[in-house]
C-alpha cells in the first residue's frame, strides 16, 4: 500500500527551515539533541493551556557560558505570561536549572490560530474528549480555517468513532491540498484524543499557498484581511464611482 510521507519533513530545506538552529562539535551533538527534546517536552507540558504551536531553539556560545534562546509561539499569550510574567519567569528559572545555561524565553502570539495545523488538531482533540461529534468538530474546523484565509484544508479522524466496535477512519476536505508540489506551503500536524472508548488519532493538512522563488514561507502566512481592503482604508460605497464624491442623502426630504 502507498503511504503518505510527512509534508513538513518532505519540504525541509526547500521552503521550510529547521526549528533547532545551532552548530556544535560532533561529540556534543547527541547531548544537545537530548537537551532540545527535554526543553520541548517541558514547554509543551507546562504551556499546554496556552496553545503551543511551535518552539524554535537557538544556541550561542558566549564567553562566560552558553546561551539558549527559545521562541515560543502560542495562541494565548496571557496564559503563557501569567500575572506580572510570573509563569514565564518560573519556566526560565526551571530551564536554567535543567540545562545549566543562560535561557532567554520569548513568547510570540499566533494571530490566526484557526489556520495553524497544530492548534486545529489540538482543538479537534479537545472537542472529541468532551464527547463532541467527530463530524461536527471537523466541519467547524474546516469552516474556521477557510474563513481565516487558508486555501485548502483536509482533516482525518481515526479510531473507534462514536464508540463503534470496529475502528475506522473518516475525514473531510475542502479546497486544494497539493501534497506532491514541493513549493506548496502545506502545514501538517497530528494529535491524539483520549476518550472513554479508546484513543482517536487526528491528522490535519492546511494549504497556505505556493512559495515562489525569492519568497519565504512567511509570505504565504500573512494575517488574513477581508477582501482587498487595507487596514485604515475607508470602504467606498458600491454605487459611487472612483474619483467621485459620494452623494449625500437628505433624510428630511420626501420623495413624491
UniProtKB/Swiss-Prot annotation:
Annotated transmembrane regions: none
Query: Does Ribonucleoprotein count among this protein's keywords?
Result: yes
Pfam families (alphabetical): KH_2, Ribosomal_S3_C
Q: What is this protein called?
A: Small ribosomal subunit protein uS3
Biased-composition ranges, Low complexity, are: 240-250
Segments forming domain KH type-2: 39-111
Which species does the entry assign this protein to? Acholeplasma laidlawii (strain PG-8A)
Q: Does the keyword rRNA-binding apply?
A: yes
Q: PANTHER family, per this entry?
A: 30S/40S RIBOSOMAL PROTEIN S3, SMALL RIBOSOMAL SUBUNIT PROTEIN US3C
The gene for this chain is rpsC
Offer a single GO CC term for the protein: cytosolic small ribosomal subunit
Family per UniProt? Belongs to the universal ribosomal protein uS3 family.
Q: Where is this region: Disordered?
A: 219-256
Function, as annotated, reads: Binds the lower part of the 30S subunit head. Binds mRNA in the 70S ribosome, positioning it for translation.
Amino acid at each position: 500500500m502507498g503511504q503518505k510521507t510527512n509534508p513538513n519533513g518532505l519540504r525541509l530545506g526547500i521552503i521550510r527551515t529547521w526549528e533547532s538552529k545551532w552548530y556544535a562539535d560532533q561529540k556534543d551533538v547527541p547531548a544537545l539533541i537530548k537537551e532540545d527534546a527535554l526543553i520541548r517536552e517541558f514547554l509543551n507540558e507546562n504551556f499546554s493551556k496556552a496553545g503551543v504551536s511551535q518552539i524554535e531553539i537557538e544556541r550561542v556560545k558566549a564567553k562566560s557560558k552558553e546561551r539558549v534562546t527559545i521562541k515560543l509561539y502560542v495562541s494565548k499569550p496571557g496564559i503563557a505570561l501569567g500575572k506580572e510574567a510570573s509563569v514565564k519567569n518560573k519556566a526560565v528559572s526551571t530551564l536554567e536549572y535543567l540545562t545549566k545555561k543562560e535561557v532567554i524565553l520569548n513568547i510570540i502570539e499566533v494571530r490566526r490560530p484557526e489556520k495553524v495545523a497544530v492548534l486545529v488538531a489540538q482543538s479537534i482533540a479537545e472537542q472529541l474528549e468532551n464527547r463532541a461529534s467527530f463530524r461536527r468538530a471537523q466541519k467547524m474546523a474546516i469552516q474556521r480555517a477557510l474563513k481565516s484565509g487558508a486555501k485548502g484544508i483536509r482533516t482525518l479522524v481515526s479510531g473507534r468513532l462514536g464508540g463503534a466496535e470496529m475502528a475506522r477512519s473518516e475525514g473531510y476536505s475542502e479546497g486544494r491540498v497539493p501534497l506532491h508540489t514541493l513549493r506548496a506551503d502545506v502545514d501538517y500536524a497530528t494529535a491524539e484524543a483520549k476518550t472513554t472508548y479508546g484513543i482517536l488519532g487526528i491528522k490535519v493538512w492546511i494549504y497556505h499557498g505556493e512559495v515562489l522563488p525569492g519568497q519565504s514561507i512567511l509570505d504565504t502566512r500573512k494575517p488574513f484581511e477581508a477582501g482587498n481592503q487595507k487596514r485604515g482604508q475607508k470602504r467606498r460605497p458600491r454605487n459611487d464611482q472612483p474619483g467621485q464624491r459620494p452623494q449625500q442623502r437628505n433624510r428630511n426630504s420626501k420623495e413624491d
